[in-house]
Amino acid sequence: MVLNLTTTLMEWRADPDVKAVAIRGSSKEGEFGNFCAGGDIRFFYNAAISGDRDLDTFFTEEYKLNHLIFNYPKPYIAFMDGIVMGGGMGISQGASLRVVTERSKVAMPETNIGLFPDVGGGYFLPKCPGFIGEYLGLTGKVLTGQQALAANLADFAINSDGLANLWAILESKTETAQDKLEKCVQTIRLGSLKKDEGWIDTEIHSTFENEELSTIMRILENSESDWAKKTHSMLSKRSPLMMSVSLKQIKLGRH
């Protein structure tokens, strides 16, 4: 899939007849489906154990694709419906327009498997308000569409029942590309949902502003709040090395 996407996007980049790109997930059960759940973890594990060089090739090609998307010269619209995690974030966060729905489940869960937020996570997580990026990068918390909007990981949230109409607008053959794009954006604006900031605990910023993982863990351990206890319990099950790497990565991404 990575190679196919790269090849197609490069062809479209050079094609003057292609004015914009829109990307979505699909499923057998309907026109729209989960956007992208990321890489095949079983493949990663087996390849690492066996010393399969395809593992290095995969990551090299994936990161090339991410770079291509983040620097794409034409409008690139990502309809982030359903699951959008890991690699799915890598092919959506560089979009000109990021659209989520009430069905979206957005996350960078790499620390769950002893990895760090890759696919551009060191670039887009620092752009979250305050120190939410550090919190999301270390915990891998799954956000709804409207929560992702509050974290600056989406531009608009809409009801999923409006997706088919938006796609139909873009597929219209009776309007110019510019008119279709403007109509699509206008329709999204009219049906947009409000961001949900209710999940942003007041302790997030004062805790995750710290530079060292040990300081963050100590603050969480000493706090009496339910949020801190749950967060401490969660992080205690993760690799300290990879959490430290992730924290440093996101801090450096601010500069």
Positions of the model-derived regions?
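Hydrophobic/aromatic residues within transmembrane alpha-helices
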Residues: 23, 40, 91-92, 147-148, ...
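Contiguous mid-protein beta-loop-alpha structural module that forms a pocket-lining wall or clamp
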Residues: 120-177
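Conserved CoA-thioester-binding segment of acyl-CoA-metabolizing enzymes
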Residues: 1-24
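Charged, low-complexity intrinsically disordered regulatory/assembly segments
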Residues: 229-232, 243-255
